[in-house]
């Protein structure tokens, strides 16, 4: 199995976890957005601390060096990466949770948040990354698929929550590009730990500044906090960091937007929700876009010539 295939599978698993987390996030919309984010982020830190130790022990048993930064420069780079990725993730997650709190429609939230699938390659142009025609066609197919899947009744009027979710998509795009820049240079699990420590501190400060967090809230919403903290934050974002290595960030964003597909399929399989022909067509188009983006068309055409 090639590294690209393995990384793509990690990102698909990441998308699967994120897709099921939308329901949990919506269930937590009755809680303050920053308080909910603080709860899930501290839970992620608690999960990642022993995970780092476990990976170090595994590497030692295999005779490989662990991921600890060995020099002051490496430690500084890890802190810089964690601070940048964590700040972007905090801002993106806060915008998303605030948007969902104002309008708990998971369908529209899923569509608008997944617009990073277009924004990542667009922002990449400013960094000198020109995507192939194959990639841009895949992006267009993905947007059509997302619209068919998520927007059953059209947009309706633009709400303030929509602008927050679009801001979330912009910030997630920056976070994806930051992970793409830093992840090949350091241990991915450690980067995820520092990233979520930054998110935890930022969201805790914001919760005390703008909300009135109470222990009763954390008890009431313990289920959504635990699921989002352990699975969506602790596991899925670590898979994102590991999966983005050696993978074009535009292709990575395309794979991760499958969270909308997995959200719909999960509702159909587990909650027995109806999946219309329109929604099924959206799922098919999204999967087709991901496959098209990774087909070695250039190599195939050269071999035929």
Task: Map each language-model feature to its residues.
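Glycine-/small-residue-enriched transmembrane alpha-helix faces in small-molecule transporters
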Residues: 1-39, 48-49, 87, 91, ...
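Juxtamembrane helix-entry segments on the extracytoplasmic side of multipass membrane proteins
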Residues: 3-7, 29-38, 74-78, 136, ...
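Helix-helix packing/entry segments at the starts of transmembrane helices
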Residues: 15, 39, 109-115, 179-200, ...
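Juxtamembrane helix-loop-helix junctions in multi-pass membrane proteins
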Residues: 16-46, 65-70, 104-108, 174-198, ...
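Specific transmembrane alpha-helical segments of multi-pass solute transporters/efflux pumps
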Residues: 21, 55-112, 148, 229-247
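Transmembrane alpha-helical segments that form core, pore/gating elements
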Residues: 45-48, 119-122, 126, 139, ...
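C-terminal transmembrane-helix exit sites in multi-pass transporters
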Residues: 47-52, 116-137, 261-281
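Hydrophobic transmembrane alpha-helices of multi-pass small-molecule transport proteins
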Residues: 48, 131-151, 203, 257, ...
């Amino acid at each position: 199995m090639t590294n690209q295939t393995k990384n793509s599978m990690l990102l698909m698993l990441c998308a699967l976890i994120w897709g099921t987390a939308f329901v949990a996030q919506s269930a937590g919309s009755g809680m303050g957005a920053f308080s909910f984010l603080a709860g899930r982020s501290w839970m992620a830190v608690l999960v990642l601390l022993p995970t780092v130790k476990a990976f170090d022990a595994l590497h030692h048993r295999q005779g490989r060096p662990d991921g600890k930064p060995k020099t002051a420069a490496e430690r500084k780079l890890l802190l810089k990466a964690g601070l940048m990725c964590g700040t972007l993730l905090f801002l993106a997650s806060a915008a998303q949770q605030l948007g969902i709190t104002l309008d708990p429609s998971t369908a529209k939230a899923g569509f608008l948040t997944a617009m990073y699938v277009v924004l990542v390659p667009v922002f990449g142009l400013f960094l000198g990354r020109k995507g192939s025609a194959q990639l841009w066609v895949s992006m267009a197919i993905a947007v059509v698929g997302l619209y068919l899947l998520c927007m059953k009744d059209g947009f309706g009027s633009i709400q303030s929550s929509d602008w927050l979710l679009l801001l979330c998509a912009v910030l997630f795009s920056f976070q994806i590009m930051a992970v793409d820049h830093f992840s090949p240079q350091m241990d991915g699990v450690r980067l995820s730990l520092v990233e979520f420590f930054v998110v935890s501190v930022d969201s805790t400060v914001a919760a005390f500044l703008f909300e009135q967090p109470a222990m009763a809230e954390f008890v009431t919403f313990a289920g959504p906090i635990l699921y989002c903290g352990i699975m969506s934050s602790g596991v899925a974002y670590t898979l994102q960091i590991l999966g983005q290595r050696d993978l074009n960030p535009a292709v990575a964003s395309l794979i991760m937007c499958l969270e909308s597909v997995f959200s719909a399929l999960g509702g159909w399989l587990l909650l027995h929700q109806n999946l219309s022909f329109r929604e099924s067509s959206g799922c098919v188009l999204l999967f087709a876009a991901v496959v098209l983006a990774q087909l070695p068309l250039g190599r195939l055409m050269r071999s035929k010539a």
